[in-house]
């Protein structure tokens, strides 16, 4: 069976599919954020990915993997405000820098992508796993692929594994107290509510896995 690697045109389609998935979850993400924040997280995510989708539509057909990621990150950051705009923008741009010159995303490149994203969000957000942030989901996805034997795992299966790990980690943030950001000032009031950023990342990973599985 041929390897189902992700080409630059594939990556553009995947990110557009992610934008649609985020749009469908806008109200849910706003509801999650209303419990511990301003209630506009879903709006921010939708606006950011609408900007990504518009940017991707304007890019030349010859754009590379790193170009898709870098331009997407810049578009997301430029269209949104607040911490999540900076974090997701830097995650995408960091992944682009880490995959410079890469022609396709396979299993080894997925590891590089997630590892660079975790490093970017940890640095920009000054957070660590367990702080009830998007990092909890990113870290879980990264760990899931880091512990997978490359020879025994296809890219769709590896991405599915990462998606499941991110989803579980996002839900587990409901039992955590926030240690960074504005939510950290709410104390026990955040208990029982999952972190909206972590849930958003799990939606992104799920959409990526679904697109590749259905291709």
Task: Put a short name on every predicted segment.
Residues 1-215:
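N-terminal loops that bind phosphate or other acidic moieties
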